[in-house]
């Protein structure tokens, strides 16, 4: 391990750099720097040599050219163990640079701003930074390269232990981190620019680069024989399972995360009052609105108490102690997630130490559109996320729905969007009465919804029915009418719409078309 004698520091994120540079200076390391970083370090009382002085060449083109010079890259790429490299460096007056501390212009943060222009984005594409990082990382046998402030302490501790050197194993690990960082950076640029054409913004680029960071190594995947890990998007900001803070409980499993995502995204649909969603195997088994969270939970649980066992529970408001106690006293639960959790509720749930309690923060009323991905063998299906709900509802039956039926229809319709297809949801008074999920025939989903309601002791008479897609035959309507359903909401669009509408009229049911399908596979 050679002693570090010279370090080049140039940063956008200057977190912790003054303290880091001060300790480097304590080992006699000469510090080279540029622009704002150099000023910050000088203002802190450190001796800094400008890169332009080191190279004998001025910064130019509004700072676009600062470090793109042989005296920088020769000092980084020259192999200290190669006599020819050493001789060439000496011949041209190139001094070795043993450490690079660089992070990049904030391109992703810049383009995350809805007001970002193409010019703004272009000016935040870093050129010199990635070039230095790659040069230093390539020659990691001789150069320490630091791209993450979280590594400052590790580097300093090694220098302290060795008298000013960094182990080659550490240099290699840091170099790998650099290539991961620059790949993500270039991927973000490629994705953003690739979706822009001369005519504006295209939805899909010709190529896409997905960049996720590992957040958790898991014991196993969907099943115990499968290995797994959880990766999160680098710039995700909206309240989600990916950004949630775990307050207590065991580590989240692969299935926990998938089910919690389903529950949270479903409960986000409801803003008219306190709401609760209970999910099992990614399907809502109970959804309800109440005067408060406790009532919402009680009603959601009542839909299907058996399926709620071992489920995931999501709320759209702060979890209070009374609701937390009702859950813990009544059922086994894997995960509870809410925008916030009261201190008293945390204390209540603490008695059940294995319950995973998550706090996700408040979400916007209108979530930003995002892309949805599904892996297939050898490919990737990409679509925009199904966030929309039909703005225009069309009554196609002779009978108009009552005001309460219309409220219940829209409630059930929102739930159906989160039930695996074929999806049927029975609802009444802001509560699911029965849920039929994942059947190959729609009429069987309707039958299951009725069976669920009967099994839970819930009255179907006067309830409404929502279907995620059209009814291909009238049998689903006949079946619903037989158990007491009085109104139906569905997309419409079947070749047999006329027969289906006629069936509704025969039974005196109201029927509403949305014109929008919500398959979920």
UniProtKB/Swiss-Prot annotation:
Q: Which SMART domains match?
A: AICARFT_IMPCHas (SM00798), MGS (SM00851)
One GO cellular-component annotation of the UniProt record comes to: cytosol
What would you give as a GO molecular function for this chain, any one?
Answer: phosphoribosylaminoimidazolecarboxamide formyltransferase activity
Instruction: List the coiled-coil residues.
Output: none
**Catalytic reaction list:** (6R)-10-formyltetrahydrofolate + 5-amino-1-(5-phospho-beta-D-ribosyl)imidazole-4-carboxamide = 5-formamido-1-(5-phospho-D-ribosyl)imidazole-4-carboxamide + (6S)-5,6,7,8-tetrahydrofolate; IMP + H2O = 5-formamido-1-(5-phospho-D-ribosyl)imidazole-4-carboxamide
**UniProt record, GO biological process:** 'de novo' IMP biosynthetic process
Q: In which pathway does it act?
A: Purine metabolism; IMP biosynthesis via de novo pathway; 5-formamido-1-(5-phospho-D-ribosyl)imidazole-4-carboxamide from 5-amino-1-(5-phospho-D-ribosyl)imidazole-4-carboxamide (10-formyl THF route): step 1/1; Purine metabolism; IMP biosynthesis via de novo pathway; IMP from 5-formamido-1-(5-phospho-D-ribosyl)imidazole-4-carboxamide: step 1/1
The Swiss-Prot or TrEMBL note on domains reads: The IMP cyclohydrolase activity resides in the N-terminal region.
Q: Which PANTHER family match?
A: BIFUNCTIONAL PURINE BIOSYNTHESIS PROTEIN ATIC, BIFUNCTIONAL PURINE BIOSYNTHESIS PROTEIN PURH
NCBIfam families per the record? Answer: PRK00881.1 (NF002049), purH (TIGR00355)
Family from the record: Belongs to the PurH family.
* Protein's name according to its UniProt entry: Bifunctional purine biosynthesis protein PurH
Annotated source species: Geobacter metallireducens (strain ATCC 53774 / DSM 7210 / GS-15)
């Amino acid at each position: 391990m050679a002693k570090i004698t010279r370090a080049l520091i140039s940063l956008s994120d200057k977190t912790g750099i003054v303290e880091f540079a001060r300790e480097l200076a304590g080992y006699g390391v000469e510090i080279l720097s540029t622009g704002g970083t150099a000023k910050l370090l000088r203002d802190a009382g450190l001796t800094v040599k400008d890169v332009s002085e080191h190279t004998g060449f001025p910064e130019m083109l509004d700072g676009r050219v600062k470090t793109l010079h042989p005296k920088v890259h020769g000092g980084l790429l020259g192999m200290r163990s190669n006599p020819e490299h050493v001789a060439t460096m000496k011949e041209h007056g190139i001094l070795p640079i043993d450490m690079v501390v660089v992070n990049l212009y904030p391109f992703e943060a810049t383009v995350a701003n809805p007001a970002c222009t193409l010019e703004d984005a272009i000016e935040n594409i870093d050129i010199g930074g990635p070039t230095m990082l790659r040069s230093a990382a390539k020659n990691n046998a001789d150069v320490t390269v630091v791209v993450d402030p979280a590594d400052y302490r590790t580097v300093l501790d090694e220098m302290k232990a060795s008298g000013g050197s960094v182990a080659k194993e550490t240099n290699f690990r840091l170099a790998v981190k650099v290539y991961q960082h620059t790949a993500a950076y270039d991927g973000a640029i490629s994705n953003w620019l690739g979706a822009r054409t001369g005519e504006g913004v295209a939805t899909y680029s010709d190529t896409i680069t997905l960049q996720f960071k590992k957040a958790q190594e898991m014991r196993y995947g969907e099943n115990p024989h499968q290995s797994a890990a959880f990766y999160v998007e680098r710039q995700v900001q909206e309240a989600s399972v990916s950004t949630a803070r775990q307050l207590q409980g065991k580590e989240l499993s692969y299935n926990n995360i998938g089910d919690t995502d389903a529950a949270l995204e479903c409960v986000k649909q409801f803003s008219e009052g306190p709401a609760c969603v209970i999910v099992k195997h990614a399907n809502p088994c109970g959804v309800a609105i109440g005067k408060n969270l406790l009532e919402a939970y009680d009603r959601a649980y009542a839909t299907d108490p058996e399926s709620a066992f071992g489920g995931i529970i999501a709320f759209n408001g702060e979890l209070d102690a009374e609701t937390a106690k009702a859950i813990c006293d009544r059922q086994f639960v894997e995960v509870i997630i809410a925008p916030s959790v009261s201190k008293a509720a945390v204390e209540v749930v603490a008695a059940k130490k294995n319950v995973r309690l998550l706090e996700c923060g408040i979400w916007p009323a209108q979530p930003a559109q995002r892309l949805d991905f599904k892996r297939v063998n050898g490919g990737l299906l990409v679509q925009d996320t199904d966030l929309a709900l039909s703005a225009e509802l069309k009554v196609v039956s002779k009978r108009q729905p009552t005001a309460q039926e219309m409220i219940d229809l829209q409630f059930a319709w929102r739930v159906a969007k989160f039930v695996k297809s074929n999806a049927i949801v029975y609802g009444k008074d802001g509560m699911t009465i029965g849920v039929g999920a994942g059947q190959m025939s729609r009429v069987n989903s309707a039958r299951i919804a009725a069976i669920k309601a009967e099994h839970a002791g819930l009255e179907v008479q006067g309830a409404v029915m929502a279907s995620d897609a059209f009814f291909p035959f009238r049998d689903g309507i006949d079946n619903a009418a037989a158990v007491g359903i009085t109104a139906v909401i569905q997309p419409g669009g079947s070749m047999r719409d006329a027969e289906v509408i006629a069936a509704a009229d025969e039974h005196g049911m109201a029927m509403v078309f949305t014109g929008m399908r919500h398959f979920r596979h």
